[in-house]
Amino acid sequence: MEESRFDSEDVDYAEIVVVRHGETSWNAERKIQGHLDVELNDAGRQQAQRVAERLSKEQKISHVYSSDLKRAFETAQIIAAKCGKLEVLTDRDLRERHLGDMQGLVYQEASKIRPEAYKAFSSNRTDVDIPGGGESLDKLYDRCTTALQRIGDKHKGERIVVVTHGGVIRSLYERARPSARKVEKILNTSVNVFRLFDGDKWTIQVWGDVSHLEETGFLQSGFGGDRTSG
């Protein structure tokens, strides 16, 4: 493998490989997770092994960061073990959006069981908090983009991995491409490569790559990946 620092000593960016966690049973059942702490299922662990194998064959990873929720942390541990037995550094600011009273519900039933929460969740406004302690999209955006910038500032000239959640990755995309069309599905263990430059410039080099899953038979299911699945 290559060195963890890039060839040029004056590289002015950090390369951050942002990975969504593997599948959970709640993803498969379309249950809303948010901050609820659900473990990977067997399919999710196999997905994590595949993405770990892939990343271990690419440019060397210097650090692995993760949300502290189990589904992300376990995915990160599998990647870290394969990429040089690295320590996983957790950051609560990489957690999924808190979805308030929506959490724990099957998505199709949420509008009937928690209509006020569903209304807030479905709003076109980005400043609406979800009843039950949930976050607005603006709060999620500020939290997770600040976290990634903080991580990037520490690791200029390095390639690192960040394991997080679908809602977070969607916000990171909006930070890098504010005028682009909104993204819909973020697949489990998809690889998304960001470069964070000096001067707060972000670019996306790779988006939504799940080529490591193509031979596993997992790809067709989609693994949730919509904005409710976490």
From Swiss-Prot:
The record marks 165 as: Transition state stabilizer. PROSITE patterns: PG_MUTASE. GO terms for molecular function: catalytic activity. The active site is at residues 21, 96. Gene3D superfamilies: Phosphoglycerate mutase-like (3.40.50.1240). InterPro entries: His_Pase_superF_clade-1 (IPR013078), His_PPase_superfam (IPR029033), PG/BPGM_mutase_AS (IPR001345), PGM_Phosphatase (IPR050275). PANTHER family: BROAD-SPECIFICITY PHOSPHATASE YOR283W-RELATED (PTHR48100), PHOSPHOGLYCERATE MUTASE-LIKE PROTEIN 4 (PTHR48100:SF34). May play a role in carbohydrates metabolism. This is Phosphoglycerate mutase-like protein 4.
